[in-house]
UniProtKB/Swiss-Prot annotation:
Keyword check for ATP-binding: no
InterPro entries referenced in this protein's UniProt entry, alphabetically: Ribosomal_uL18_bac-type, Ribosomal_uL18_bac/euk
Assembly and interaction partners: Part of the 50S ribosomal subunit; part of the 5S rRNA/L5/L18/L25 subcomplex. Contacts the 5S and 23S rRNAs.
Function: This is one of the proteins that bind and probably mediate the attachment of the 5S RNA into the large ribosomal subunit, where it forms part of the central protuberance.
Entry's family note: Belongs to the universal ribosomal protein uL18 family.
Encoding gene, per UniProt annotation: rplR
Biological classification of the source: Bacteria, Bacillati, Bacillota, Bacilli, Bacillales
Keywords: Ribonucleoprotein, Ribosomal protein, RNA-binding, rRNA-binding
Xref: SUPFAM superfamilies: Translational machinery components
Protein's UniProt name: Large ribosomal subunit protein uL18
Molecular function as annotated in GO: 5S rRNA binding; structural constituent of ribosome
Highest taxon of source: Bacteria
GO cellular component annotations of the record: cytosolic large ribosomal subunit
């Protein structure tokens, strides 16, 4: 009998493997990405203090998005989180793709964050 592979369980294992080697510091916090079917979320986290420094998502009303599950929306989120992080004095981050492939919405968010002042 063939069992169906749970994609999210595989992603969680991949994310745990990556997180064991990756941590955000005070000088270089972690830019974490979570992607659902409808939304994308990004936050800049200082793992030493356990504090979120900046966050943005497609659920934010001030972004004024018509659709929340496409590449353009992800780019707006990347732009917003980068601007908030730069305002807080964060220039360099460690990118945590959350176990997702660096493609599509995740890549669009990362590229927009780079264009708006974050280095990774």
């Amino acid at each position: 009998m063939i069992t169906k592979i749970d994609k999210n369980k595989v992603r969680m294992k991949r994310h745990a493997r990556v997180r064991s080697k990756l941590a955000g510091t005070t000088e270089r916090p972690r830019l974490n990405v979570y992607r659902s079917n409808k939304h994308i979320y990004a936050q800049v986290i200082d793992d030493v203090k356990g504090v979120t420094l900046a966050q943005a998502s497609t659920q934010d009303k001030n972004l004024g998005l018509e659709t929340t599950s496409n590449v353009e929306a992800a780019a707006k989120v990347g732009e917003a989180v980068a601007k908030l992080a730069v305002e807080k004095g964060v220039k360099a981050v460690v990118f945590d793709r959350g176990g997702y492939l660096f493609h599509g919405r995740v890549k669009a968010l990362a590229d927009a964050a780079r264009e708006n002042g974050l280095e990774f």
